[in-house]
Structure formats: structure tokens, C-alpha cells
């Protein structure tokens, strides 16, 4: 087995074993973390978070065997995050989700020990400083990931466009065209956030991420959530294993400070 297929979320290839192939898994700025809201430091110097997302920059939707991912055209600065803790704009490369088998777990970050059923990650890279996503992903200030918690409740009308496309990528390594999806529709009303220096939450676990975790969750219906759970970790020819519990548990903070853009 080669490349990204030598890790997963099972008993033998799951997060507790990743350090064998990726020693950085035990590094000093690993993600996700449990955000202890009372210990987050309000930082008035933090800028407001600005998300400039153009409507028609999405390209495709893919089941990569670990999650479902939407890729974006990142050839220019039309779809970026800026402000917040960031110096300059970071371009949106892709978004993906993590979710659980049941509604009491699924998110990667937790808040005061509480898990959410799912977490959306919007992955951006520093194109002002680095020439490729790969180069940025290896640099300490290369990536900015915006995390959004999902909870179940009312249906999220804008999410239907995405959940209705999931049947096309049910199996691992399947891909479909997915154009003109604006991820702005998946953001909560409030832009309050926590931020801290961290890592990718999947191998190679590079410590290259400025994390921006939005405080306010978005809501989707249980029916919409079930469509994520109907995806498969496996290819069409393999025994079917449902794609659930594809999250890494919280990692030690190791002295890092979590900053808050708001006063608790």
C-alpha cells in the first residue's frame, strides 16, 4: 500500500498508530485540540475575519477514501480568507468534512469537552509567500484552516446542493464535476472565532496550520447528516465499510495559547 492509503480510521491504521509512520504526530503543535473557553485569551488586536468567496470557483467533489472533498480553482485571489490572525490573504484550496456514526461525536475540535456531530474544514494557503500548495503545506505559516462545527436540527437548504451530490461519490476514489458551489453559504452568521497554531489533522500532520475555529455552529438536518454516513471508505470492489468516525481525537496543547476574537 502506498501514499495516503497506508492510514485510516480503523483499529490498526487509525490515529493512535499514525505516529509510527508520521513521528510528527507527537509534535508540539498538533491538531485538533479541546478548546477550553475559559482559558482562551481575548485578544483585541485580532482583526475581524474576512471571507471573500466568489460564487463559481468550485471544480469537483471527490471521495478520497478518508472524507468527501470539494476542490476549488486557486489560481488567483478571488476566493480568500484574510484578516483575523493572518497577514495577507490565503487562497481556498479545498473543503472537506469529518463526522461521526452517531450525533454525540464526529467533530475534531471540541469545546469544553463537547463534541459536535460534524466539522467542516475550509483549507487555505499562503500564495503571497509560497508558489504552490505543497510548498505552503510544509511551512509554519503556510496554511489557514477555518473550522465550522455542524449540529443537527433544522434542514440547511444550501447544504442540499452538496448532500444531493454525495451519491455520485459514494465509493472511494470516485470524483464528479461540482461547479458553482459557493462555500459562503456554509458559514454561520457570527464571525467570532478562536485561533491557535496547529497542524493538519490527517497525515502528513504537518505543523503548518493557523487554525481559525468559528464559535457559532451551523445546523443541518439528521437526514442531511445521514447522507454523509452513507459514503464508503471502500472501493466498489471491496467489502463495504461505511465512512463514519473519520476524526482525530484532541491532541495535547503543550503550552500553546488559544486566542479568542471575542470576550467570553
Swiss-Prot record:
Gene behind this protein: Ca7
Cofactor entry: Zn(2+)
UniProt catalytic activity: hydrogencarbonate + H(+) = CO2 + H2O
Alpha-carbonic anhydrase domain mapped to chain residues: 5-262
Pfam families registered for this protein in UniProt: Carb_anhydrase
GO MF entries: carbonate dehydratase activity; zinc ion binding
SMART domains according to UniProt: Carb_anhydrase (SM01057)
Listed GO biological process terms: neuron cellular homeostasis; positive regulation of cellular pH reduction; positive regulation of synaptic transmission, GABAergic; regulation of chloride transport
Localization: Cytoplasm
Active site: 66 (proton donor/acceptor)
Similarity field: Belongs to the alpha-carbonic anhydrase family.
Protein's name according to its UniProt entry: Carbonic anhydrase 7
Enzyme Commission no: 4.2.1.1
Role of this protein: Reversible hydration of carbon dioxide.
Residues annotated for Zn(2+) binding in this entry: 96, 98, 121
Alphabetical list of InterPro entries matching this protein: Alpha_CA_VII, CA_dom, CA_dom_sf, Carbonic_anhydrase_a-class, Carbonic_anhydrase_a-class_CS
The UniProt record lists the keyword Repeat: no
Amino acid at each position: 500500500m502506498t501514499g495516503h492509503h497506508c492510514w485510516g480510521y480503523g483499529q490498526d491504521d487509525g490515529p493512535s498508530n499514525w505516529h509510527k509512520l508520521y513521528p510528527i504526530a507527537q509534535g508540539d503543535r498538533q491538531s485538533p485540540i479541546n478548546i477550553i473557553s475559559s482559558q482562551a485569551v481575548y485578544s483585541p488586536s485580532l482583526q475581524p475575519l474576512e471571507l471573500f468567496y466568489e460564487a463559481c470557483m468550485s471544480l469537483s467533489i471527490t471521495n478520497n477514501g478518508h472524507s468527501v472533498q470539494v476542490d476549488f480553482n486557486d489560481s488567483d485571489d478571488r476566493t480568500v480568507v484574510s484578516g483575523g490572525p493572518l497577514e495577507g490573504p490565503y487562497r481556498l484550496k479545498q473543503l472537506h468534512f469529518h463526522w461521526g456514526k452517531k450525533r454525540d461525536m464526529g467533530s475534531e475540535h471540541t469545546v469544553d469537552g463537547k463534541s459536535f456531530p460534524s466539522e467542516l474544514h475550509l483549507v487555505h494557503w499562503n500564495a503571497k509567500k509560497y508558489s504552490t500548495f505543497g510548498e505552503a503545506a510544509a511551512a509554519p505559516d503556510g496554511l489557514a484552516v477555518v473550522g465550522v462545527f455542524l449540529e443537527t436540527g433544522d434542514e440547511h437548504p444550501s447544504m442540499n446542493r452538496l448532500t444531493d451530490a454525495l451519491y455520485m461519490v459514494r465509493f472511494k476514489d470516485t470524483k464528479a464535476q461540482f461547479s458553482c458551489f459557493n462555500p459562503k453559504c456554509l458559514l454561520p452568521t457570527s464571525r467570532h472565532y478562536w485561533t491557535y497554531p496547529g497542524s493538519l489533522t490527517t497525515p502528513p500532520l504537518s505543523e503548518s496550520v493557523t487554525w481559525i475555529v468559528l464559535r457559532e455552529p451551523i445546523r443541518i438536518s439528521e437526514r442531511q447528516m445521514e447522507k454523509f454516513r452513507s459514503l464508503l471508505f471502500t472501493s466498489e470492489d471491496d467489502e463495504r465499510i461505511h465512512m463514519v468516525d473519520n476524526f482525530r481525537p484532541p491532541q495535547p496543547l503543550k503550552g500553546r495559547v488559544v486566542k479568542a476574537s471575542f470576550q467570553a
